[in-house]
Amino acid sequence: MALELNQSAEYYYEENEMNYTHDYSQYEVICIKEEVRQFAKVFLPAFFTVAFVTGLAGNSVVVAIYAYYKKQRTKTDVYILNLAVADLLLLITLPFWAVNAVHGWILGKMMCKVTSALYTVNFVSGMQFLACISIDRYWAITKAPSQSGAGRPCWIICCCVWMAAILLSIPQLVFYTVNQNARCTPIFPHHLGTSLKASIQMLEIGIGFVVPFLIMGVCYASTARALIKMPNIKKSRPLRVLLAVVVVFIVTQLPYNVVKFCQAIDAIYLLITSCDMSKRMDVAIQVTESIALFHSCLNPILYVFMGASFKNYIMKVAKKYGSWRRQRQNVEEIPFDSEGPTEPTSSFTI
């Protein structure tokens, strides 16, 4: 994968263009990419560490609150819970890709396939659950909801999202392997043409970005118009939240998908004709995909922590934890001779 993170970014190459010297068929000389490899060894582990720590903390809190404390869940709650689970599973793969960037893949062929597929499943499903949240918010504002809780259709939608993401990860399970240079990378048979490889790339862009972006754009624009028309309510805060959600999605996802689209076009028309351009493309995919996955760290803030109800649950949990700590400290501070009558003992001096 181009970024040592995204399993789908290099379907049209037989070797990892970031970590290896790649000989384009149109080139007369070999393109040496040592500086690209050195950049990846420094940038990817550092960025992944920050994303892993911050994202793991935020999404773990979301899962814990929704799973153990919030018993009455709405459809949005169910989507947010699934989104947090997807983000957690995505973040769990980052340490493996950080090690791969520095030392190569050391966990074997099967783990290479599973980790690559796990990344794709959760990256794609996360984008789809964002679209589901936007639809439910639009419906809640503009239509009279038929029921307040999450019913069977909501869970069916969640299952469909997961199944679609799993189907999209099949190429990772089939083509990813550990090559002779100990890197987890896709290897394609020669009979598979570049058009098929580019088609897989375009399918991922469509399902993982274009469709969610269009749904979110339409739903949140309609929601904003409905909020503006509503009398006697404070509109500024909800509108700011909607704007923040859309802006963060565009800033984090658009650059990566533009670069990914350029790679797909290059697979068909061979637009990259110089080594320097190829190196710049490698660095661009590393940086933009890292920014794209950082969205999983921001989801708890955008979709959960801004909500008043979730803040109340956090306060309740904090109070329970504080009460438990105080009780434990009080027990530890009680002296051994402070309770109950003492048995009479004989006293003497030596």
UniProtKB/Swiss-Prot annotation:
GO biological processes: chemotaxis
Transmembrane residue ranges: 42-62, 78-99, 115-135, 155-175, 200-220, 241-261, 290-310
Gene3D superfamilies, per the entry: Rhodopsin 7-helix transmembrane proteins
Outcome of gene disruption: Mice have a larger thymus with relatively fewer cortical thymic epithelial cells and this is associated with severe reductions in cortical CCL25 distribution and accumulation of DN2 thymocyte precursor cells in the medulla. The downstream effects materialize in reduced proportions of DN3 cells and significantly reduced numbers of cortical DN3 cells. Aberrant thymocyte development culminates in increased prevalence of spontaneous autoimmune-like disease, characterized by lymphocytic infiltration of peripheral organs.
One Gene Ontology term, aspect cellular component: early endosome
Entry keyword set: Cell membrane, Endosome, G-protein coupled receptor, Glycoprotein, Membrane, Phosphoprotein, Receptor, Transducer, Transmembrane, Transmembrane helix
Residues with glycosylation annotation: N6, N19
Ranges of the Extracellular topological domain: 1-41, 100-114, 176-199, 262-289
PROSITE patterns recorded: G_PROTEIN_RECEP_F1_1, G_PROTEIN_RECEP_F1_2
Residues on Cytoplasmic side: 63-77, 136-154, 221-240, 311-350
Gene Ontology molecular-function annotations: chemokine binding; chemokine receptor activity; scavenger receptor activity
Localization of this protein: Early endosome; Recycling endosome; Cell membrane
InterPro entries on file: ACKR4, CCR1-9-like, Chemokine_rcpt, GPCR_Rhodpsn, GPCR_Rhodpsn_7TM
Post-translational modification: The Ser/Thr residues in the C-terminal cytoplasmic tail may be phosphorylated.
Tissue and organ distribution: Expressed in lung, heart, spleen, skeletal muscle, testis, astrocytes and microglia. Expressed by cortical thymic epithelial cells.
Family (UniProt): Belongs to the G-protein coupled receptor 1 family. Atypical chemokine receptor subfamily.
Biological role: Atypical chemokine receptor that controls chemokine levels and localization via high-affinity chemokine binding that is uncoupled from classic ligand-driven signal transduction cascades, resulting instead in chemokine sequestration, degradation, or transcytosis. Also known as interceptor (internalizing receptor) or chemokine-scavenging receptor or chemokine decoy receptor. Acts as a receptor for chemokines CCL2, CCL8, CCL13, CCL19, CCL21 and CCL25.
PANTHER family: ATYPICAL CHEMOKINE RECEPTOR 4 (PTHR10489:SF733), CELL ADHESION MOLECULE (PTHR10489)
Complexes and interactors: Forms heteromers with CXCR3. Interacts with ARRB1 and ARRB2.
Record's protein name: Atypical chemokine receptor 4
Gene name of the record: Ackr4
